[in-house]
Amino acid sequence: MQTNLTFTGLFTLLSILVYSQFQVIGLAPQFANESMYLWKYEDYLSGRLSLLQETTISEDGVFKFNGQTSGITKLVLGTEELKSYIYVQPKGNYKVEFVSENPQNQSYNLKEEIELTFFDLDSNDINFKILGFQAWLDNYISDIYFDKDFNPSLFSKKIGILKLALMKDAQADTSSYFLDFMNYSVASDVDNINFVGAPSEMEKYSNYLGNNPILYQHDYYMAYFETFYNQYIHRIEPELSNSLFKAFAAGNLNLSDSLLSKDPYASVPELRSLIRIYILKQALNDNFLPRSVILNNLKLISKESIYPIHRTIAQNI
């Protein structure tokens, strides 16, 4: 009996060490007595959400969620029609306001996204850091953007100064999630600007994708991945694209992987496998492949991929 109690106590202690509580208290007076939900992304590529909690907003417009997280996680909260997002971290306490500019608008099929208003946000919280960085970067780029066309060399120099400043800031921050956020914000919002001295596509591939681990749980990494490989099937060599079509039609995963490996931006096996899933996802919305072929390949990947997370993503799509 003593042994069982000891093991139980140890398991409880380990659970506490791995997971930590967070709390969200919100004000949503426009939606009193309605249901409020809290979701988590199963994966960012499919965009599929799984329900974590449901509560009812009080007559006073107050709602509350309590949960556990082992690290920084992006969650979605909202009603059935209107949604917003929040990053939560261990021991995080959040006071937010959930207000729609058009609460009486019946066109809820527009799926309006609401921007949360935070109160008393801790300066060490990930939301504080992200919101502050986004505002600062937007202002910096706005201030120097005039130089891009009228003084290109000065613009390039100021971009260099920006990156040096960010490197210095990165050394002072211990949050790997925030550092990755900074890195892929620069990749998306700075390096994608067409300016003198801007990195080439191959340099961007090497800097942000080819030589880095895939950050499946980081929304900014996955957003950059989707931008970089957007309509990828239409950007590769036509002959390769046609051969890939035949491989998909035959349901030959080994062949489609082998064909994609010929492209310089798909040189890493795990990344290449993810690219293939993304190609199939985008093909659902165009005429490149019959829907039956797409679904068959996704089904095969969900059963046969050597990467467990890819099996999940393919299943979710």
Over which residues does each language-model region extend?
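A non-transmembrane, solvent-exposed segment enriched in polar/low-complexity residues
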Residues: 21-174, 181-184, 189-208
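Helix-turn-helix repeat elements of alpha-solenoid scaffolds
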Residues: 155-163, 246-254, 288-295
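Structural detector for internal amphipathic alpha-helices that build alpha-solenoid repeat scaffolds
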Residues: 278-286
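Bacterial Sec-dependent N-terminal signal peptides
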Residues: 1-27
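Amphipathic alpha-helices of TPR/Sel1-like and other helical repeat/solenoid scaffolds
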Residues: 158-169, 256-259, 297-301
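N-proximal helix/coil linker or "cap" segments that precede and/or mark the start of modular domains
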Residues: 285-317
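Charged, long alpha-helical assembly modules
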Residues: 175, 181-268
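Short solvent-exposed coil/turn linkers within tandem alpha-helical repeat scaffolds
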Residues: 172-177, 215, 303-309
